[in-house]
């Protein structure tokens, strides 16, 4: 099978499983974990419930099989405020190596686990990742170097909506619960050639302030996910 390192957006992967990195206190407030929380809210609820029961410990892997792709939550921190530890990262990698066949996983996408908010040097993470994952049988492995400019399916959907110009900010408000005045800002940001991804949009600054806050980011992800599935709140009737 194959082992590939690439730059891009891990959420574009076609792999049957994808790895998220988490703490053990039920918080997904930043980094790749926040992206997972926004894209898979039901997974987050299940993870949080297990954390609140004190069942998840550093070095363990929490699978979530109700989504496509399957999500493997690698617990590489105890508390979100604290750094990760190399031994916890190694423990999760070893557990994965010992169990991927049993789980039936034949393809998977990894981030550089622990390199962004884990506080572990990237070269250390690369060494460990290659040590455990680069020569496995019966599985295709992708390891993603995060590219903040790489678009994803959700951003492409948003861009298509903006470029089609078929829905007014007021209609989009009715469909998403994001106020029309924020939709105006979102639309303007998407039209900016410097905006290439959801990540860019979430950090888009106007007059020293981000145009979209936490609540509206959650609503935007929810709207775009439902829009792609053809499931969303219909615009209010004219009658």
PLM region spans:
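Macrodomain-like recognition of ADP-ribose-binding/processing modules
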Residues: 1-239
